[in-house]
Design a protein with these regions (language model features):
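ATP-dependent NMP and nucleoside kinases share a basic, alpha-helical "lid"
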Residues: 65-119
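NTP-dependent small-molecule kinase module
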Residues: 72-73, 113, 135-175
């Protein structure tokens, strides 16, 4: 754990100087909603051994908080999030590209539980968002990302054999 750090794409949604009502209407499941330039620069700087200040995203308010989190560079940098392989400049910085493939039923159930419990959303709003933006954007952008992955992990992350292989690949890269 001391030799790794992680960085999530979800913290770099683009700044929105709009009202709450306007922010709620934004399609956050499209690659254009992320500040990919900022995220790519952060990854580049971490790989160069620099400490970075990462924004914190407030999902209940649909905007970045004023606070930031300091992230120290480590030997292993784990990136998580959608669209990581979509941007060539970012994708080129990733040594091992892992796509965790999860069944659609599991994805919607996880989203409902997370958004209702952690983000205070109504069930109706989560289902509407899933049908209007999440599912179509998944089919348009996320499914094609599988082709860019070095490793595809089936079973939504509950695949010990696949993760043992990933750990071995990381160890090999470090040596």
């Amino acid at each position: 754990r001391d030799s790794s750090t992680s960085r999530g794409l979800g913290d770099v949604y683009k700044r929105q100087d709009k009202s709450f009502e306007e922010r709620v209407q934004i399609n956050y499941d499209h690659p254009d909603s992320f500040d990919m330039e900022r995220f790519t620069d952060d990854v580049r700087r971490l790989k160069a051994g620099e400490t970075i200040e990462c924004p914190v995203y407030n999902y209940a308010e649909y905007k970045r908080d004023k606070d930031t989190v300091t992230v120290e560079p480590k030997r292993i940098i784990i990136l998580e999030g959608l669209f990581l392989f979509e941007n060539p400049a970012l994708s080129d910085l990733i040594d091992i590209k892992v796509f965790v493939d999860t069944d659609a039923d599991v994805r919607i159930l996880r989203r409902i539980i997370r958004d209702v419990k952690e983000r205070g959303r109504s069930l109706d709003s989560v289902v509407l968002q899933y049908l209007t933006t999440v599912k179509p954007m998944h089919e348009r952008f996320i499914e094609p990302e599988k082709k860019r992955a070095d490793i595809i992990v089936p079973e939504g992350g509950y695949n010990e054999v696949a993760f043992d292989m990933i750990v071995d690949a990381i160890k090999h890269k470090l040596n």
